[in-house]
A protein has these predicted regions:
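Feature 926 captures the class I aminoacyl-tRNA synthetase adenylation module centered on the KMSKS loop
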Residues: 1-233
Length: 233
């Protein structure tokens, strides 16, 4: 699976490079929520997502090695179990994440080619819905794995409040995971009923709301845990 993940990331970059050869120097680079072009930029901006995918692919490999090494070398059973759990979570999430982001890159490439012909896939109802569904699926994926992460400094919903102790970490990551899943599902469902251009807008609103509410909840959990420790002391 790890090898397949790297192959997909490399294929995404390869296809992007092939398309770039046929594109002019300046291409549509930014769209509003209705899919209309609002800015033109260098065609090499299309390389951003494929490069990020490759970095995520190889970065996840080093993270897996880090967690596996920590699980083998630590003398604490608790830390060993946490490292093994984080390695498992990372191994589960990286493939579907790479696949979804590669699909998003494919949509962007297709839309760029159409935009140069005076058309736009993203400005159509189908394009808006497809992109919203892909981003919504990514939120659902991330939200599902957040509660499975154990306290660490590399992956998860990491704030100074959430990392205070295992209780604040577990409660905050579980809540943030639920909020992201809800945002993704609401976005996917909303796009079935929303007019053209509103799918991505609604998903962006849901995502921002989920993040803000999760941060506030993390602060509340941290305050409650500090108060509980003071009462015990």
């Amino acid at each position: 699976m790890k090898q397949l993940t790297r192959m997909i990331a490399a294929l995404c970059l390869f296809v992007t490079l092939l398309v770039l050869r046929e594109l002019p120097a300046q291409i549509p680079a930014h769209y509003d929520f209705a899919g209309n072009v609002t800015r033109y930029g260098s065609k090499y901006e299309l390389l951003i997502l494929p490069v990020v995918l490759l970095l995520l692919s190889f970065g996840s490999r080093f993270l897996l090695l880090h967690f596996h090494r920590k699980a083998e070398q630590t003398e604490s059973d608790k830390e060993r179990q946490a490292a093994a759990a984080n390695a498992k979570v990372l191994g589960i999430v990286i493939f579907p994440q790479t696949l979804i982001l590669s699909c998003i890159q494919g949509v962007l490439l297709y839309n760029t080619v159409l935009a140069l012909r005076g058309e736009s896939f993203l400005s159509t109802l189908a394009g808006d819905k497809l992109l919203t569904i892909l981003f919504g699926a990514l939120l659902v994926l991330v939200g599902n794995v957040l509660p499975k992460c154990k306290r660490n400094g590399l992956v998860g919903f990491r704030l100074s409040w959430t990392r205070y102790n295992d209780i604040t970490w577990q409660k905050s990551n579980r809540f943030a995971g639920i909020m992201l899943v809800a945002a993704g599902i609401f976005g996917i469902v909303s796009t079935a009923f929303s007019p053209k251009g509103y799918g991505m807008l609604l998903l962006a609103v849901y995502t921002m709301a989920a993040i803000v509410i999760s941060i506030v909840r993390a602060w509340q959990v941290y305050r409650a845990e500090k108060a509980r420790e003071r009462d015990r002391g």
